Amino acid sequence: MKQHEAILDIQLKELKLSTFKSNWNDAEQFAISKNYSYSQYLSYLCGIEIDKRIGTRLIRMIKESKLPKNKTLSSYDFDSCKSINKDQISALAETDTWVNQAHNLIIFGASGLGKTHIASAIAYRKIELGMRVKFFQTSHLVQILQVAKQQFRLKEEIIKLDRIPLIILDDIGYVKKDEHETSVLFELICHRYETSSIIITSNQP
């Protein structure tokens, strides 16, 4: 390796441009073969860096979301359930207006309808568009909130979710109807009312 190349590697490492560091040489050869100008070469290399960062961020956001795997709109069988409006679901997935306005979405119906699939698919698309989401089995979240309440940190636990514009409460109908469980859930929903969005799925209307 030539001295200036070694220095460049050190500089790129210092700038935390790891994809630049790994690809500048191959990108240079490609740019030469295409007769790119210096600015075109730099733009091409920046594109590689950006694509890598977007991919890395997407992987991190999907992992953080705890969404069920392989639940996308393309994998949902709309033909098997004529009561589900594909265009309407697609519009909810593609547009951010309802989330920006802190509207909520309730998906209810009989078992086997694919409510969790639809909710997860909408949320997955939101992640692809750069939005943070979080999926919860409602009964599990209630347990977390109950423990937090016993430890006098319920408000703190609820506020932690403020950084997530969209959360999914799956199978809310399975939450026991006793006061302890419903009260913490009520506090969460009230806290997010008109500030952040929730998708709720349930077997009961």
Regions of interest found by a model, annotated:
Residues L17-K69:
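Interdomain "pre-motor" coupling segment immediately N-terminal to P-loop NTPase/helicase cores
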Residues Y76, A119, Q137:
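Conserved hydrophobic/aromatic pocket- or pore-lining residues that grip, position, or stack substrates
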Residues L73-D96:
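N-terminal pre-Walker A segment at the start of P-loop NTPase domains
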Residues M1-K21:
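Charged, compositionally biased N-terminal leader segments and the immediate start
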Residues T97, I107-M131:
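Walker A/P-loop
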Residues N104:
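Walker A (P-loop) ATP-phosphate-binding motif of ABC ATPase nucleotide-binding domains
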